[in-house]
Amino acid sequence: MKKEIKKNYRIGIIAALQQEVQILFNKLKNYKINKISNITFYIGNIHNIHVVLAKSGVGKVFSGITCALLLQKYKVKFIINIGSAGSLNKNLKPGSIIIPTNVCYHDVNLTAFGYSIGQIKNCPKTFLSNTLMLKLTEKYLFENKIKYQKKLMISGDIFIDTCEKKSLLKKRFPKAIAVDMEAAAIAHVCYQFNIPILIIKSISDSSDINAADNFKYFINLASKNSSLVTINVLQTLFKNTKNILFDNNNRC
């Protein structure tokens, strides 16, 4: 007998680009496609897990809107952000996996009012990934001998493509290992709505003068690696959904 899909446990998965959602889309069964304000949502199931896969578009505003729609319209129980990121760490090469423990904005500065660089008023210095979800993902990566790093990742509406920009970020955020354009905004929305988040990214470039060319060359590799880890982690996460929902450390 076919196992029933438990639709009460919808998982929202967000990526910015078509390349970043394509592999998961190819795995979707019994899917339908919706478009809201030029944001594409793919509703279906992967390995009998009910998911809403969203292609947000690039940047903080698009990704934030997408996350809010997933939470309000599609009533997802938790969010996974996947896709590519630029490296700020010499040990992270194209294709490397990162699962950030926390994220913040690199293009926010309210230090004149006593806040830390990257901190929004009435919010913490960084937004945290869900502890249990991180542990389950780490367990999968460790058991399958997949190398990864997990520290701070920073986000902003800037593609980092010079050594000067990279050096400035490393100076301002010495603990950051990678940079993208969406994760902090998605985590911010999850934080406001008290929804847990997991971020699974793969490196596409080194955030330097060759970043644009390397991004074009390695985006498919980064998308593939991020997606394959996500697909394999989904089943583990689903088994622990109830625990995850009660282990939320993402509240303002």
Curated annotation (Swiss-Prot):
Disulfide bonds: none annotated. Transmembrane segments: none annotated. InterPro entries: MTA_SAH_Nsdase, Nucleoside_phosphorylase_d, Nucleoside_phosphorylase_sf. GO terms for biological process: L-methionine salvage from methylthioadenosine; L-methionine salvage from S-adenosylmethionine; purine deoxyribonucleoside catabolic process. It comes from the Bacteria. Its EC number is 3.2.2.9. GO terms for molecular function: adenosylhomocysteine nucleosidase activity; methylthioadenosine nucleosidase activity. GO terms for cellular component: cytosol. Gene3D superfamilies: Nucleoside phosphorylase domain. The active site is at 20 (proton acceptor), 205 (proton donor). Substrate binds at residues 86, 160, 181-182. It catalyses: S-adenosyl-L-homocysteine + H2O = S-(5-deoxy-D-ribos-5-yl)-L-homocysteine + adenine; S-methyl-5'-thioadenosine + H2O = 5-(methylsulfanyl)-D-ribose + adenine; 5'-deoxyadenosine + H2O = 5-deoxy-D-ribose + adenine. Signal peptide: none annotated. Pfam families: PNP_UDP_1. HAMAP family: Salvage_MtnN. Catalyzes the irreversible cleavage of the glycosidic bond in both 5'-methylthioadenosine (MTA) and S-adenosylhomocysteine (SAH/AdoHcy) to adenine and the corresponding thioribose, 5'-methylthioribose and S-ribosylhomocysteine, respectively. Also cleaves 5'-deoxyadenosine, a toxic by-product of radical S-adenosylmethionine (SAM) enzymes, into 5-deoxyribose and adenine. Thus, is required for in vivo function of the radical SAM enzymes biotin synthase and lipoic acid synthase, that are inhibited by 5'-deoxyadenosine accumulation. Homodimer. Belongs to the PNP/UDP phosphorylase family. MtnN subfamily. This is 5'-methylthioadenosine/S-adenosylhomocysteine nucleosidase. It comes from Buchnera aphidicola subsp. Baizongia pistaciae (strain Bp).
